[in-house]
Amino acid sequence: MNLRDYIRDIPDFPKEGIVYFDITPLLAEPKAFQYTIDQLAERFADYKIDKIAAAEARGFIFGAPLATKLDIGFVPIRKPGKLPYETISVSYDLEYGTDNLSMHVDAVAKDENVLLIDDVLATGGTAEGMVKLVEKAGGKVSGMGFIAELTFLDGKSKLSGIDTTSLIQL
């Protein structure tokens, strides 16, 4: 199955000059969505993974069902102020400023192996922030999985030393 067939290009969104890669057609097709989860599970089958963590919101779409398929826990990573319990946070650099990510203080235990999942690897800012957050909690990043990678933005360069995989390269 060619997953690229289920990614819609939206020119000039969210602003002029940007092409947005819309995953909603993939979500609308159950066989394509299941294939996506199965492919991620297959790629990480031999990894030592205790938990999967994913950033809101689209990372949740893929991370939670993958965690269920692998029979491991899921950790939601959110913007500050969105989680009800005590949190730890990190700030990370974006192309035009900084942002923050948070998770519950007890979400990742010391030395737990965590697989990070997100929908798209673009500039690498969010991915780098997720790595910092897991490491701040004392966890180890086992790898990172993405549905698509925008190779022309070279986000992988911010993740040196971390095994990353993408199902689609754009």
Curated annotation (Swiss-Prot):
User: What EC numbers are recorded for this enzyme?
Assistant: 2.4.2.7
Query: Looking at the keywords, is Chaperone present?
Result: no
The record, for PROSITE patterns, names: PUR_PYR_PR_TRANSFER
Localization, per the record, is:
Cytoplasm
Q: Which Pfam families match?
A: Pribosyltran
Pathway(s) of this molecule: Purine metabolism; AMP biosynthesis via salvage pathway; AMP from adenine: step 1/1
One cellular component (GO) term of this entry: cytoplasm
Domain of life of the native organism = Bacteria
Which molecular function terms from Gene Ontology are attached? adenine binding; adenine phosphoribosyltransferase activity; AMP binding
Keywords associated with the record: Cytoplasm, Glycosyltransferase, Purine salvage, Transferase
Q: Which reaction does it catalyse?
A: AMP + diphosphate = 5-phospho-alpha-D-ribose 1-diphosphate + adenine
Q: What does the similarity note say?
A: Belongs to the purine/pyrimidine phosphoribosyltransferase family.
Q: Which HAMAP family does the record match to this protein? A: Aden_phosphoribosyltr (MF_00004)
The protein's name: Adenine phosphoribosyltransferase
Species the sequence originates in: Maridesulfovibrio salexigens (strain ATCC 14822 / DSM 2638 / NCIMB 8403 / VKM B-1763)
